């Protein structure tokens, strides 16, 4: 089976090991790459000998094997022992085992090194398969290479006899034994340089800029080994998997500047689409007889999962079943369900359709593959039933019930799945890739890469709409991903994958889009692969101009080409064919079955090929006569330079054109195209005519071939020169005209084109010009069959002219309105658009190219080329001899200056704009008796380009140029093999292929570990295209030497490296190769060392980077500046501007995991991405940052959000032994305080400030001022709005100095009384009345404030530890005491009061450090209300707050005249690399809460621009380890609220739970302030909803935006709060919950919670032990590896320990323990409770009784007043550190989903009635 059509750039793209390939195929591929270097290709063994013999003679030496205790160097080489070899430091030396007869130490069974020296054909097959390394058979593959380094002197002294020593790991790789004899020799670096190196990694997120830095740091200019471990920055780990040299796998190689690294992720996200088309239920007639779905469920998927398990891959899997259902239009019309509501898209048969998507699993760990297969089987049973039932609930909002009939109207069984050919594959792919537009938000720090696999029962051919193809192509190109297609049907006989599409039938009404200069579809995507079946007399010139570039919205239709099929092969789709029999054989081979087929051999075909198409003409031919028969096979246009006849040109008379003189390179695509597409290839070499020489070119030397072709062309084209001025139409017959006539009854011919020919690397096609007169059309000439024995083309027929035809056809075309007509030859058609008025003359440019009036030229029956009617505005209409010629241009056909009078209106404008040709030929046209579209007075003269193919020729319109590189038009029936192997077929992924892939096998390597987009590419436009089709935007960047707050790049080299890194992380690729050399005229770019920034930063050095249609050029100019030039394709800018107001609205029916029915969703499919402001980004990197007010959003920072969730503590745990005197709440606050100390310790300080601080090392960092309060932020803001103090909240700590230097105190020289006076004085500590859980503490201060004061004001206190020690001494002497007399003095949020004997009477609560507004003493004070100097509450807008705040009209009167502004969080620069392991500053923005209720979540958000993600992840892991010691769980959660998940992830949707019994009105809240009796009563309508969430252990995450007072402007440092509903999170972190305005619950699984834990759980033990010490579990802490990890999907159906025994504390519920629960179990328990009216009513009554009973007063307690505040503390404060007395019942719940006891709920709910902060109330609780 030949190679398929373009095996495009799937990032899953690598051919698997050659276990299924033949040895001959592998060898032929290797030879094909070296043919151009030698006339006689050498064999691999000859190359090896030649390679090994380079340098000096071999030397024999003794090899030692050492371990790391001896030396950490991999290879030790004693250079002094080989002085005669002339070895120098830096030389590359190869090691080969020495072989001796009878040497048992080198037996093939034990020593791989000796075995590798044996030839593969000498080895026995048993030895070949007995070792997994047996495929490295030759010395080239198995040799060991190393770079000479100086030998350490100490080792040389201790071991003088050491010659060569390798580590144990290298010895194991190469099979070396200790003290064995080896041969060494010097080799040239170029000979051993690797072409590709596969590098795999897992359990980490790596951006491509880190890959680039890793290669520069660890691999460049070094030797790499298979299996080599790579560690970068101490945390990024990778492994070398494969090394390729000239297409062969080797064990070691030199990583040269031209080596291409291919990074593969073993922890990626996979989206598997299974197309449930009609064929999925068909039986396999040739195999087992099972339906095709069984191939998926029993064959392909189990094989894929097994390979994942064997490779230890840890992917996340999403599986979606999708199909398109076609409905009977009459049945739909007769029903109550209108077709408009059903669908807005009609299929090719013009029947209503609906697309269905069923999400089976979502982000499930690949290790749960048995569960995945079970779910697939369950859904398959009901899938067909569910999509076939049309259930009408409402005509406006249709839903499709999965269970059956509706109550209101009966369900209708209608429709059936479409075939795979007409499926919705493009929509599914676009849908899956849409979430990548938000890839920088909620970044998963464990998985890298997204792979999309589409499994289809078809054969790889799809009918699609042009709009879908263009939109999907644009989206995938911008987002840098590719798709893998796995087909279950046999491979067809043509190129695949193939997309069939029709011409768009609409056009925009604007002139800009009608103009060819600004519009028009890609010619590459419009070439016809079907006969032109319409017999319309003509295509009007006006309609020819009306081209549409998106077809999204238009009312004007133009001449319909909808009956024409066009064929294209996309670059972004790779294809495989699953054959169960093949892999059954491979399994037998792996199991060493004696009856298994022998690998590396060609298995004889057991079945004969049965033709699927019978053609009468072919059957009537003799086999040997077919080359001389009268059937001519025209070529299908397949490139951008091809014009095609429209439907108006059917039935032109036959004619042919002779190809012009051209030079054919050996690997030229012409070589394989000179044959009939229906003829078997082996037959082609049996010809005896002159053409036989052309087909046997490989047997000749290139020089002989070129000489022969030149002579041949001279003879062929000689007669045309004599007739170039002939104008009289005549019936001149083509050469061999009598022999080439065919019957009109069966005119079936196969079309194939060679227009889409790539430029060859070394040889250009020669050219010449031929003028061809165009005679006036005449009536058709009937043709007759003649003797097929005469050749189709003779030199003796040079006096005859070819004729012109308009009709092309091929055997695989679909049905058309007219049967195809056979022609004796391929013909050229000319369509004159003369009817256009002068005013429209400008729009006529490109009309010929648009109309495709010329399809191909045929030199003979089996050779043809194409005439391209290409637009060229800069080339006026004039004789060809005056036409400027530019290299690499497509074929163009020009109209001569002589025109009839009627055509004079065309004289003033270019007839064929944008056409510049290198190889041009003017060809005279013979009789065309059917050109009757418009009368022709004189035949125009044509300029025909026979170029070998600039696929980016300028003949394309701007829109086509934007899409052309990504979808190429080909002749699927016979695409040349060289063209398919051309790297350009692979687009952006061309460098991911060490050797050409095959379509016949499944690419297991790519499916197991998808490749990341390569760092380099060769895709680049031509110089003229770059000048004419791209908009240039230049600007310059220079480092900011005066930047504040962060270290700016100091040199141009550092700045350049950061700018390149930023672009690589955003999907750009560094451009190399000949194309960029031609455009820039810098030959250093042919193969630049992209891994050496020192070479890139030299003055004048240029770097090109590209992404899709955007190109950036970076030039190092004089000084320290870098000049940036952005090239933006004109079409891209047009598309971007147009897409802002236009998008595709897609309305599929989707059923998510827990959804009971299919729901129609309106999804905006936007193919464009938001324009990135690179000027801002580059200047931001350079240190110019003052002009950005919100860089995180403006520059698309990577953003993640974490929350600290307070957990229930078990005080018998070893880790809590040190907190015996602390209650749960205090331990949680200690944890947050400990984190703030870490943040302050690692706060990023620029080097200048650090040097300044080093001189003043006395003072420690102060803790961040986080205001702790026991009510929610909205309650605090509402209650204390009139007490807001207008101070600057930007002060994170106390003033730097309170007392002057001369007045600083000393511990030894101060008395308690004087110290008490100072502390309570104006320069002392803040004394105020503070409320905590409804208990008011008068005249108290906080522990960390006194600690800071002591540190600042005592000369002999240098640390906070000393301050705490001194504070405890003061406390022992009676200066102050804890308000509850429970604690010593601590540096934290502890309340202390001055003892009565030292207390100074104060008339009012005050803050001693800052001036304040006199408070209303009738109102009890709060920590926020009166301690507001450090509060984040401000009366003016902060400079760092978001400026785009939407002002709202206050709904309640405000006592402040101006609208108050409150910032609830702060930000700081944090250094994630304190140990300086990276070569650049690694800084992130850390956002943290300034107001915090210990009962709620504490919010942390991280954002960064160019920081290493692995370092960030390590930092977060260290935070999590610290927090867990204090009962806090650090969990990653989405930034957006749960109800907005479907905006970014289309396959997810919140699960709605409704209360079966409506709750009663909530109790009247109480609030203790002066306004309690004056304000109106505000009921909390969500009181019972919040109580129910607390019952199921949910804690408050964020409040709704509407919860805050309307006259207060609330903001966060990261933006404005925009939550529509309040959001809660389960204590496990696995489920999010929201309460809607209607009183329903929205629940959503948090898929971000468990990625790291799952990876850690699955981590092999040796990897777990290798973790850094700071991330290991310590004594008294909890190791997440040993705990039950969170499940990755609510659909995982894990077996959970639901019925686990009671804990020692007596808690029966899982929720009480710190164990993760599967989200579905939490949801199920919650939904069951909400669906039980009896249990709900009981809950309402109990909650209401508790609420009303606590209104009288505090709940009675038996504890002393010293142990509990006067009002009441929540259970978390008083209960969990006290073990229950013996005999008391354990606090358990009957319901597993109700984790807490009724006793605790009673205490909590009693606080709710008073507006307790534990109530979760989001409204001000007050009596108003």
Curated annotation (Swiss-Prot):
Q: Which GO terms describe its molecular function?
A: GTPase activator activity
Q: Taking every annotated instance into account, which residue ranges of this chain make up the domain DEP?
A: 1321-1396
Q: Where is this region: Disordered?
A: 28-48, 644-682, 719-964, 1406-1460, 1797-1824
Which PROSITE patterns does its entry note?
Answer: DEP
What membrane topology is given?
Peripheral membrane protein
Point to the regions of Basic and acidic residues compositional bias. Answer: 734-762, 1798-1807
Where does the record say this protein resides? Answer: Vacuole membrane
Q: Where is the composition biased (Polar residues)?
A: 28-41, 815-828, 1444-1460
Q: What GO biological process terms does the UniProt entry carry, in alphabetical order?
A: intracellular signal transduction; negative regulation of TORC1 signaling; positive regulation of autophagy
- Low complexity: compositionally biased ranges: 646-659, 779-799, 854-864, 947-961, 1809-1824
Name the domain of life: Eukaryota
Bias (Basic residues) ranges: 720-733
Has UniProt tagged this entry with the keyword Membrane? yes
One GO cellular component this record assigns the protein to is: GATOR1 complex
Print the keywords alphabetically: Membrane, Vacuole
Q: Please tell me whether the keyword Membrane is annotated for this protein.
A: yes
Q: What is its main location?
A: membrane
What family does the database annotate? Answer: Belongs to the IML1 family.
Q: What is this protein identified as? A: Vacuolar membrane-associated protein iml1
Taxonomic path: Eukaryota, Fungi, Dikarya, Ascomycota, Pezizomycotina
């Amino acid at each position: 089976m030949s190679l398929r059509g373009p095996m495009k750039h799937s990032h899953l793209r690598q051919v698997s090991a050659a276990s299924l390939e033949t040895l001959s195929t592998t060898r032929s591929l290797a030879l094909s790459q070296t043919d151009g270097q030698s006339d006689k290709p050498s064999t691999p063994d000859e190359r090896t000998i030649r390679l090994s013999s380079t340098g000096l003679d071999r030397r024999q030496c003794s090899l030692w094997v050492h371990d790391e205790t001896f030396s950490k160097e991999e290879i030790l080489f004693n250079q002094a022992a080989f002085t005669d070899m002339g070895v120098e430091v830096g030389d590359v030396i190869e090691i080969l085992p020495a072989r001796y007869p009878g040497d048992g130490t080198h037996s093939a069974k034990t020593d791989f090194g000796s075995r590798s020296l044996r030839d593969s054909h000498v080895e026995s097959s048993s030895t070949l398969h007995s070792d997994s390394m047996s495929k490295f058979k030759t010395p080239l593959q198995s040799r060991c290479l190393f770079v000479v380094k100086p030998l350490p002197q100490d080792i040389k002294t201790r071991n003088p006899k050491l010659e060569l020593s390798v580590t144990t790991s290298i010895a194991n790789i190469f099979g070396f034994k200790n003290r064995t004899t080896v041969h060494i020799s010097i080799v040239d670096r170029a000979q051993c340089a690797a072409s590709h190196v596969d590098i795999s990694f897992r359990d980490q997120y790596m951006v491509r800029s880190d890959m680039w830095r890793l290669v520069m740091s660890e691999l460049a200019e070094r030797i790499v080994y298979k299996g080599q471990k790579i560690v970068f920055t101490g945390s990024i780990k990778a492994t070398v998997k494969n090394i390729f040299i000239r297409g062969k796998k080797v064990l070691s190689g030199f990583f040269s500047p031209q080596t291409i690294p291919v990074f593969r992720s073993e922890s990626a996200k996979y989206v598997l689409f299974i197309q449930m088309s009609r064929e999925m239920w068909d039986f396999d007639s040739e195999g087992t007889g099972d339906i095709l779905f069984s191939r998926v469920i029993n064959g392909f998927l189990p094989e894929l999962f097994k390979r994942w398990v064997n490779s230890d891959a840890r992917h996340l899997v999403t599986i979606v079943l999708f199909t398109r259902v076609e409905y009977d239009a009459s049945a739909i019309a007769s029903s109550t369900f209108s077709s408009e509501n059903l669908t807005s898209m009609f299929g090719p048969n013009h029947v209503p359709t609906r697309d269905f998507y069923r999400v089976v699993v979502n982000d499930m760990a690949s290790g749960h593959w048995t569960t995945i297969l079970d779910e697939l089987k369950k859904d398959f049973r009901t899938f067909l039933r569910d999509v076939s039932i049309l259930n009408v609930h409402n005509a406006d909002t249709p839903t499709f019930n999965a269970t059956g009939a509706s109550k209101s109207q009966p369900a209708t069984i209608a429709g059936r799945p479409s075939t795979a050919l007409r499926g919705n594959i493009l929509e599914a792919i676009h849908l899956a890739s849409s979430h990548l537009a938000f890839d920088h938000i909620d970044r998963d720090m464990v998985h890298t890469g997204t792979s999309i696999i589409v499994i289809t029962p078809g054969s790889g051919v799809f009918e699609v709409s042009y709009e879908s193809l263009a939109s999907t192509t644009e989206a995938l190109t911008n987002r840098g991903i590719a798709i893998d297609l796995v087909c279950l049907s046999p491979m067809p006989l043509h190129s695949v994958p193939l997309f069939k599409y029709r011409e768009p039938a609409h056009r925009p009404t604007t002139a800009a889009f009608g103009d060819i200069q600004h519009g028009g579809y890609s010619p590459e995507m419009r070439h016809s692969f079907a006969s032109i079946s319409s017999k319309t007399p003509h295509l009007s010139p006006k309609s020819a101009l009306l081209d549409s570039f998106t077809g999204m919205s238009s009312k004007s239709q133009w001449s319909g080409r909808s009956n024409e099929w066009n064929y294209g092969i996309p670059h972004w789709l790779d294809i495989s064919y699953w054959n169960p029999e093949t892999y059954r054989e491979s399994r037998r081979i792996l199991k060493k079955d004696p009856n298994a087929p022998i690998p590396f051999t060609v298995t004889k075909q057991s079945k004969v090929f049965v033709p699927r198409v019978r053609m009468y003409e072919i059957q009537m031919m003799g086999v040997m006569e077919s080359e001389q028969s009268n059937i001519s096979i025209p070529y299908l246009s397949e490139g951008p330079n091809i014009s095609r006849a429209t439907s108006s040109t059917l039935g032109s008379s036959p004619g042919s054109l002779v190809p012009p003189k051209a030079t054919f390179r050996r690997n030229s695509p012409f070589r394989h195209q000179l044959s009939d597409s229906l003829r078997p290839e082996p037959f082609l070499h049996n010809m005896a005519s002159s053409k036989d020489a052309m087909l046997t070119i490989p047997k000749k030397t290139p020089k002989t071939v070129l000489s022969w072709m030149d002579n041949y062309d001279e003879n062929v084209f000689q007669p045309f020169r004599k007739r170039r001025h002939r104008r009289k139409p005549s019936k001149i017959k083509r050469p061999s005209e009598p022999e080439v006539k065919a019957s009109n009854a069966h005119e079936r011919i196969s079309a194939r084109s060679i227009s889409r020919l790539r430029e060859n690397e070394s040889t250009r096609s020669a050219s010449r010009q031929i003028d061809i007169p165009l005679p006036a059309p005449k009536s058709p000439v009937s043709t007759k069959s003649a003797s097929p024995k005469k050749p189709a083309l003779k030199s003796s027929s040079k006096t005859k002219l070819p004729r012109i035809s308009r009709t092309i056809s091929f055997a695989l075309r679909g049905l058309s309105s007219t049967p195809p007509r056979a022609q004796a030859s391929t013909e050229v058609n000319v369509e004159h658009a003369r009817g256009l008025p002068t005013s429209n003359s400008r729009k006529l440019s490109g009309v010929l190219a648009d109309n495709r009036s010329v399809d191909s030229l045929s030199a003979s029956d089996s050779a043809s080329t194409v005439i391209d009617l290409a637009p060229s505005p800069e080339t006026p209409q004039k004789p060809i001899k005056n036409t400027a010629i530019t290299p690499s241009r497509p074929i163009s056909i020009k109209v001569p200056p002589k025109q009839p009078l009627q055509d004079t209106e065309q004289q003033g404008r270019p007839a064929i704009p944008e056409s510049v040709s290198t190889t041009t030929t003017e060809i005279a046209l013979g009789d065309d008796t059917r050109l009757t579209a418009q009368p022709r007075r004189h035949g125009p003269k044509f300029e025909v380009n026979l170029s070998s193919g600039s696929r980016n020729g300028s003949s394309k319109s701007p829109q086509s140029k934007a899409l052309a590189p990504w979808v190429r038009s080909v002749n699927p029936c016979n695409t040349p093999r060289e063209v398919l192997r051309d790297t350009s077929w692979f687009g952006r992924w061309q460098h991911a292929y060490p050797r050409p892939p095959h379509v016949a096998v499944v690419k297991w390597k790519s499916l197991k570990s998808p490749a990341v987009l390569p760092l380099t590419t060769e895709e680049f436009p031509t110089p003229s295209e770059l000048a004419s089709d791209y908009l240039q935007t230049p600007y310059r960047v220079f480092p900011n030497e005066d930047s504040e707050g962060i270290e700016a790049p100091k040199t141009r080299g550092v700045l350049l490296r950061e700018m390149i890194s930023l672009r690589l992380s955003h999907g750009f690729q560094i451009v190399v190769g000949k194309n960029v050399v031609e455009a820039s005229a810098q030959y250093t770019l042919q193969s630049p060392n992209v891994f050496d920034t020192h070479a890139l930063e030299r003055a004048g050095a240029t770097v090109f980077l590209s992404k899709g249609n955007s190109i950036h050029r970076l030039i190092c100019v004089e000084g320290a500046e870098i000049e940036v030039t952005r090239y933006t394709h004109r079409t891209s800018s047009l598309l971007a501007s147009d897409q802002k107001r236009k998008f595709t609205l897609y309305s599929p029916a989707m059923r998510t995991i827990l959804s009971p029915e299919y729901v129609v969703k309106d999804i905006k499919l936007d193919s464009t991405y938001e324009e990135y402001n690179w000027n801002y980004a580059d200047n931001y990197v350079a240190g110019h940052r003052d002009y950005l007010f919100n860089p995180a959003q403006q520059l698309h920072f990577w953003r993640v959000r974490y929350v600290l969730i307070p957990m229930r503590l078990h005080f018998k745990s070893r880790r809590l032994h040190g907190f015996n005197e602390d209650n749960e709440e205090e331990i949680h606050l200690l944890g947050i305080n400990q984190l703030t100390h870490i943040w302050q310790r690692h706060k990023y300080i620029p080097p200048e400030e650090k040097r300044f601080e080093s001189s003043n090392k006395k003072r420690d960092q102060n803790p961040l001022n986080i205001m702790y309060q026991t009510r929610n932020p909205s309650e605090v803001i509402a209650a204390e709005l009139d007490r807001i103090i207008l101070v600057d909240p930007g002060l994170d700590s106390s003033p730097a100095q309170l007392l002057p230097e001369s007045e600083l105190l000393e511990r030894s020289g101060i008395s308690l009384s004087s110290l008490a006076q100072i502390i309570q004085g104006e320069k002392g500590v803040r004394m105020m009345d503070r409320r905590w859980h409804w208990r008011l503490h008068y005249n108290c201060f906080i522990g960390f404030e006194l600690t800071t004061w002591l540190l600042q004001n005592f000369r002999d206190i240098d640390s906070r530890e000393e301050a705490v020690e001194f504070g405890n001494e003061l406390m022992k002497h009676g200066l102050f005491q804890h308000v509850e007399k429970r604690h010593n003095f601590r540096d934290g949020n502890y309340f202390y009061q001055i003892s009565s004997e030292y207390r100074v009477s104060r008339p009012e609560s005050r803050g001693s450090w800052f001036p304040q507004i006199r408070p209303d003493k009738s109102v009890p004070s709060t920590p926020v209300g009166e301690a507001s100097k450090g509060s984040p509450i401000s009366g003016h807008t902060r400079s760092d707050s978001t400026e785009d705040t939407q002002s709202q009209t206050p709904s309640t009167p405000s006592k402040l005249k101006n609208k108050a502004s409150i910032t609830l969080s702060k930000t700081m620069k944090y250094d994630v690399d304190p140990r300086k392991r990276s070569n650049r500053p690694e800084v992130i923005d850390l956002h943290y809460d300034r107001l915090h209720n210990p009962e709620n979540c504490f919010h942390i958000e991280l954002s960064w621009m160019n920081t290493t993600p692995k370092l960030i992840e390590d930092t977060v892991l260290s935070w999590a380890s610290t927090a867990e010691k204090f009962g806090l769980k650090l969990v990653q959660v989405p930034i957006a609220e749960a109800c907005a998940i479907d905006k970014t992830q289309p396959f997810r949707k919140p699960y709605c739970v409704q209360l079966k019994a409506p709750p009663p009105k909530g109790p009247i809240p109480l609030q203790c302030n002066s306004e309690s009796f004056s304000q109106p009563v505000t009921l909390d309508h969500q009181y019972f909803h919040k109580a129910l969430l607390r019952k199921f252990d949910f804690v408050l995450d964020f409040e709704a935006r509407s919860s805050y007072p309307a006259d207060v402007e609330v903001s966060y440092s990261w933006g404005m709060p925009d939550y529509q509903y309040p959001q809660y999170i389960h204590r496990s972190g696995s489920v999010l919950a929201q309460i809607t305005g209607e009183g329903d619950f929205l629940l959503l699984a948090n898929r971000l919670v468990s990625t790291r834990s799952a990876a850690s759980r699955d981590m092999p033990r040796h990897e777990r032990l290798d973790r850094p010490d700071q991330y290991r579990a310590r004594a008294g802490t909890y190791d997440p590896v040993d705990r039950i990890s969170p499940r990755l999907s609510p659909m995982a159906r894990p077996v959970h320990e639901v019925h686990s025994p009671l804990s020692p504390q007596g808690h029966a519920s899982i929720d009480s323990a710190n164990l993760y629960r599967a989200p579905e179990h939490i949801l199920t328990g919650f939904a069951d409770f909400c669906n039980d009216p009896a249990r709900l009513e009981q809950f309402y009554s109990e909650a209401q009784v508790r609420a009303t009973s606590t209104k009288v007063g505090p709940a009675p307690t038996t504890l002393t007043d010293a142990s509990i505040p006067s009002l009441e503390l929540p259970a978390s404060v008083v209960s969990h550190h006290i073990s229950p007395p013996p005999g008391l019942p354990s606090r358990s719940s009957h319901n597993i989903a109700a984790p807490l006891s009724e006793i605790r709920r009673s205490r909590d709910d009693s606080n709710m009635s008073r507006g307790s902060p534990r109530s979760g109330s989001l409204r001000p609780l007050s009596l108003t």
